[in-house]
A protein has these predicted regions:
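PLP-dependent amino-acid enzyme catalytic core
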Residues: 1-453
Length: 453
């Protein structure tokens, strides 16, 4: 598979070059020259296939010729030691993406990426320096995924005071080859700093650089896997391959035959890498009817879907902090594959306030006993609004639950009481934070990187 920049389709690179470079030299994002199709037998079996088998079939065409079939098999089975179960809650599914080591959906992409990088760089002596901007969960997942990986050093930039105490310990509590910089600014500032550093010619001569944000195609592609797995189960209603029957909705069809309910997947969205991965799954042949892109008050893309005009803005802080993005990077990828008219047909945009988010967390727990984190609650409320507006009808609905609610206990527990805490998160709170504070200034960041390396 060849990849080209969203800003120049005339020059292409292979998967290894796209992944290890991260950002194209012209500042664009790498996209595949074509989005491959699942073989017919895979399309019809998504509802019953093992998660790692779906991962293998999804990723294989993107890395063909560079990662052998046996190596890819080893990578996906080492990366995906956890699943993405569908849980029936009221009239919809919760697609739980928080069963990885840092309890966030970012674990899927980060763990694959770390193992793929190790394979692609085998025999390489020069260290690789990875820069990553985070609004919360990406930093923790990347830090965990790359922790103690030989020959790779990671620097995580996060907005000071805008991540939770637990997120900060995941980002800045590991040490060894993981460093953290607390930036006096927003996530958008962190993202711009990373892009500027990756484009700096002097820095590139000094060290091998890459990024682990969703601007890196190798982190985005594996996220398509859970879309195909979830849509396959939701559309087909087949038993879970791990032995537990997938809960069914009222009126739900039991096989993928004409008349089965179309699938709507709601994606809590900020930087729009997650939704872009879903669009890849759709184009590959996953049985997805449409998406709902649910944002907080940082609603750049919902406004674009309404008007056709793309206007970035300064991000505003909310309780769903991982989605506090006013200039989503992956919008470039979306427009590389889809026109505005095409997006309008398959993506419903909706925004949700903090007040609505809090009410949703409390109401869903009171009615069902289910715990939602603030981001997943944005998705839940977004679906409620779209149903009231008659934009979603007769659909099997899945909410992508992107983080464990215990990661946001400061917001959630006052609304619903104590939350069961996974052992991995309880252990994380014992770490000490070790981060250097810097201003949102490119020369300061570059000087800091020179000092560290």
């Amino acid at each position: 598979m060849q990849y080209y920049s969203t800003r120049n389709s005339n020059k292409s690179v292979n998967f290894a070059q796209a992944a290890l470079t991260g950002l194209a030299p012209d500042g664009g994002l790498f996209v595949p020259k074509e989005i491959p199709q699942y073989p017919a037998n895979v399309k019809t079996s998504l509802g019953t296939m093992d998660f790692c088998d779906i991962a293998y079939e999804t990723i294989k065409p993107y890395v063909e010729g560079e990662i052998s079939g046996s190596a890819l098999e080893d990578i996906v089975r080492a990366a995906f030691t956890f699943n993405a179960p569908l849980i029936s809650v009221a009239d919809r599914y919760a697609v739980e993406l928080f069963h990885g080591p840092t309890a966030a959906f970012k674990d899927f992409g980060a763990r694959f990426m770390a193992r793929a990088f190790s394979f692609l760089r085998r025999g390489e002596d020069r260290p690789l320096h990875i820069l990553v901007a985070t609004s919360g969960d990406t930093g923790g997942a990347v830090a965990d995924g790359f922790f103690d990986v030989p020959g790779i050093f990671v620097t995580v930039l996060y907005p000071k005071g805008r991540v939770t105490p637990l997120q900060e310990r995941q980002i800045a509590g590991l040490g060894k080859n993981i460093s953290a910089l607390a930036v006096e600014g927003s996530f958008d500032d962190c993202q711009q700093l990373v892009k500027a550093a990756l484009a700096d010619e002097g820095l590139k001569k000094r060290m091998a650089l890459s990024s682990a944000n969703s601007i890196n195609i190798s982190r985005l592609i594996p996220q398509a896997v859970y879309y195909s797995a979830a849509a396959g189960k939701a559309f087909a209603g087949f038993p879970d391959p791990d032995g537990e029957a997938t809960p069914r909705l009222a009126g739900y069809k039991t096989s993928a035959v004409p008349g089965a309910l179309p699938v709507t997947l709601c994606v809590p969205s900020g930087n729009f890498g997650n939704l872009t991965a879903g669009l890849y799954a759709l184009k590959m042949g996953a049985p997805i009817h449409q998406f709902a892109a649910a944002t907080n008050i940082n609603k750049t893309v919902p406004d674009y879907l309404d008007s056709g005009e793309y206007l970035t803005r300064i991000s505003q802080a909310t309780i769903s902090n991982a989605m506090d993005v006013g200039a989503p990077s992956n919008f470039e990828r979306m427009t590389a594959h889809f026109s505005w008219d095409e997006m309008k047909r398959i993506i419903l945009g909706v925004s949700v306030s903090d007040e609505e988010t809090r009410k949703t967390i409390a109401q869903i727990h009171e009615k069902t006993g289910y715990f939602l984190d603030p981001h997943s609650a944005v998705g839940w409320k977004g679906i409620d609004k779209l149903i009231l507006e008659n934009k979603i009808k007769n659909s099997a609905i899945g909410i992508l639950c992107t983080a464990h609610p215990a990661k946001f206990s400061e917001t959630v527990e006052p609304l619903v009481g104590p939350i069961p805490v996974p052992a991995s998160l309880a252990h994380t709170m014992e770490r000490n934070v070790n981060a250097k504070t810097i201003p949102a200034d490119v020369p300061v960041l570059i000087e800091t990187l020179y000092e560290k390396n």
